[in-house]
Amino acid sequence: MAASTLPSGLSTNDLIRRTANPHPNVWGYDLLCSLKSPYSRDSSYKERADTLINEIKAMLGAAFGDGKEMITPSAYDTAWVARIPSIDGSSGSARPQFPQTVDWILKNQLKDGSWGTESHFLLSEPLLATISCVLALFKWQVGDLQVERGIEFLKSSLEKIKNESDQDSLVTDFEIIFPSMLREAQSLHLGLPYDLPYIQLLQTKRQERLANLSREKIHGGILQLSSLEGIEDMVEWERLMDLQSLDGSFLSSPASTAFVFIHTGDLKCLAFLNSVLAKFGAFVPCLYHVDLLERLLIVDNIERLGIDRHFEKEINEALDYVYRYWSNERGIGWGRMNATADLETTALGFRLLRLHRYHVSPVVFKKFKDADGEFLSSIGQFNKDVASMLNLYRACELAFPGENILDEAKGFTAKYLREALEKTETFSSWNIKRNLSQEIKYALKTSWHASIPRVEAKRYCQVYRPDYARLDKSVYKLHHVNNEKILELAKLDFNIIQSILQEEMKNVTSWFRDSGLPLFSFARQRPLEFYFLITAGTYEPRYAKCRLLFTKVACVETVLDDMYDTYGTLDELKLFTQAVRRWDPSLTENLPDYMKRCYKIFYDIVHEAAWEAEKEQGRELVSFLRKAWEDFVLSYHEEAEWLSAEYVPGFDEYIKNGITSIGQRVLLLSGLLVMDGQLLSQKALEKIDYPERSRVLMEQICLISRLADDTQSYKAEKARGELASGIECYMKDHPECTEEEALNHIYGIMEVTAKELTKEYLKVDDDDVPFACKKMLFEETRVTMVIFKDGDRLSNSKLEMKDHFKECLIEPLPL
């Protein structure tokens, strides 16, 4: 008999009371006591982490300066530069303009006769690089032995390919460029197997690509600039020069730029090539400059690995640099000099800049739509397209209300990525090495708004590859982006933080055992689940007090929740509520012992939270927090009265009460006000807290949490006789709608609220509220969305939740 008036002649001991604790706590105290992490005892780990931080800071200083970009050589591009004849009229054209590049080719042939990336895993890359080097050496009639060995490599490799299925992933525009170079080799009578079925297939594919490639697309600034050397017959040179970048290059490609110079003699092209060789010496990379892409990739990696707090200055400098070249009309390319924008770089830039509260507009993505409304990076460049679409999909998750183009792009990219997963050729050895399929599956399965930051950091540590290579016309590496030091620091940092959190968990468990809360056997006892709820997003050591107080308040809240929902009678609850409103413990004298104990614990935790808040904030906050708790308890009492009367309110009435009864406001305020070093003025509190203003951060958090809870728990609650839920109340207002339609309506509200919450969180020029405070609120909400993703995992600790807990707090990363 729950929340009802006590019948005459029946004592409280005679009542048959329900409980809300169907499952015991799955985390044993003995397990926690057994945790003895070496990372908390051995100071050498912390010393090594500090050393790595300093070394990486120095590395980033070099990367973000105007020095040499750490990018691997491209034999393919170097060979194109080597083909440029001397511009010195006195010597004719019988010698190269850049003889050092010819020497580099002669010295860098691999043991198997190829050129390209050593230990290559894509056959298309050495094929393209080798034919390029062979043609360059043959042009200058040098390196006969190298030419012979190169031709033998080409012959043996091509003869092994019986059909298209034998060919792995293709470097960018391979089917455009390689047949063109084969045609040149044939005109020079180089002994290659030109009649092989695979060669004929490539020729056919090239013709199909070119048939769909109009001259307008070539000269329109969108497509094929990176493969000019493969479409010589279609180029209109005067129109093409309009697409030249400020640094003289064409899409930062030394090969394409060398090709244009050979045909036009353009001095800006020559100046670009001179500048690249001045940087790198005897070789050129496949792309230069890549200063915007490199900075964005570094920031993205550091943040996804969970070590960004160590590099805040460097991250801000990198993003300030990128933003100087950002255009909401055209986006950005790989480098600051690019005349043509790139979808991957633009999408990555949009996401990171928005996350750091720069003003960026989604209008930028209109440029990447074709006449059919599809979003493109380059037609036929499938590997590149997948990466671009994944970055665009992630960018779309940061949509604000009314940004329809992001909704459109998200739908398009989700469909594209699902289809990509079904195509086996998408995930050949190239993309398997990138772990691209895992990234796509995770992105499609896990919404950014419902994800666990600490789990994501650990999993990214597990897939991050220091030897990661990117794919263009060559396989290339950006050494500042992926390297051993960054990964070592990320793993060390994760384990060191985990060891700190394990000690905190022991303190939480000890507090809980001594608090008296375990005596309330009718209530859910989830101290470690609540600790996980805050810690999975706010894990920094300095916020230990925030985590502890959040957990304590959550434990007390849950006892109150279960007492009002299931265990207490209405008469008891009225007296308890009155005692809360008057803050008078003497009013509990006529209540059962369990309620007296409950009130004392409640009273003590409220004032502990207030006193800790006052110490941190330096002003009186007891009355503020008391009022918040009063509102919270009154909302519980309202629901108890509904239950007793079997009353189902209308949707608006339910939501008005439900955003308070969900408990997020009291919970988050308690942790928020004790965050180390984060002072919240009255003005800042009013910007966060919904009793003062509507549609602010706290109200949005409470609304989306309430609805998420309802969508997962309403069936179980209805079975227990609790009739009021968002779904039932909406159906009361709309008798004609089905349960499924009501659920869809609720999901629609949640989607809109998530966008409003994102906008409030990432609001530009909102300096009154410390961003660390906003982040704590937002990250806790993300974890809450995971809790209610497939059922109420706080009430029923499911296996997946247990796995998340172990990932974050129990199992270290192997070094």
UniProtKB/Swiss-Prot annotation:
The record's note on its domains: The Asp-Asp-Xaa-Xaa-Asp/Glu (DDXXD/E) motif is important for the catalytic activity, presumably through binding to Mg(2+).
This protein's name: (E)-gamma-bisabolene synthase
Source species taxonomy: Eukaryota, Viridiplantae, Streptophyta, Embryophyta, Tracheophyta
Biological source species: Pseudotsuga menziesii
Major localization class: cytoplasm
Involved pathway(s): Terpene metabolism; oleoresin biosynthesis
Magnesium is among the record's keywords: yes
Alphabetized Pfam families for the sequence: Terpene_synth, Terpene_synth_C
GO cellular component, one term: cytoplasm
Induction profile: Up-regulated by methyl jasmonate.
